[in-house]
Amino acid sequence: MAAKDQLEVQVMAAQEMELAGKDPVSHEHEERKPVTETKEGDVTDEHGERGSFAETDEHTGVDTKELEDIAADIKEHLAAKRKRIEKIAKACSEIKNRIKNVLRTTQLKRQKRDYRISLKLPNVLEEFITDEQKDEEGDGEKEEQIKIFQEQQKRWQQDGKGTERD
């Protein structure tokens, strides 16, 4: 955990250096403690426990094994996120394809319906026109019948007046 804290401090210091316009890498070498010769048995960590020289960074005293573990955890976490993102992207594309298919199907149904209606429309219009013509003819026949009836009434009235005189 101490190595993680130390790593965070180093990262924050590097970010501050970048903001200040300094090169964090070259500045890092300036801040390091001078290297002293040590033997494998002389290396101890912060808690006084001895570790092998190969597992410890000679400049900072950070346990490289711990850093490698942290890096491995980060890689696992990123791989898991990448898989989740890929799954989400795949699901989105599937949903997008479904929506396209539904829209295409709906559009085809609408076009078929409109086509069938357009085929029926001339027949319906023709029926309407013939019905209107029949109604007009029927109106003309009714008018003729009314005229004939009125003429007959006049004759009857005239006949009735003429018979009364007799």
From Swiss-Prot:
The record's InterPro entries line, in alphabetical order, gives: XLR/SYCP3, XLR/SYCP3/FAM9_dom
Q: Which UniProt keywords apply?
A: Nucleus
Q: Which domain of life is it from?
A: Eukaryota
Name where it's found.
Nucleus
Mark out the compositionally biased spans (Acidic residues).
129-142
Q: Write out the tissue specificity statement of the associated record.
A: Expressed exclusively in testis.
Gene Ontology biological-process entries: meiotic cell cycle; spermatid development
Q: Name one GO cellular component term.
A: synaptonemal complex
Instruction: Please name the Pfam families in this protein's record.
Output: Cor1
Query: Bias category Basic and acidic residues: which stretches?
Result: 19-63, 152-166
Enumerate the residue ranges of region (Disordered): 17-63, 129-166
Q: Which family does it belong to?
A: Belongs to the XLR/SYCP3 family.
Xref: PANTHER family: PROTEIN FAM9C, XLR/SCP3/FAM9
**What is this protein's record name?**
Protein FAM9C
Give the organism the record lists. Answer: Homo sapiens (Human)
Q: Which gene encodes it?
A: FAM9C
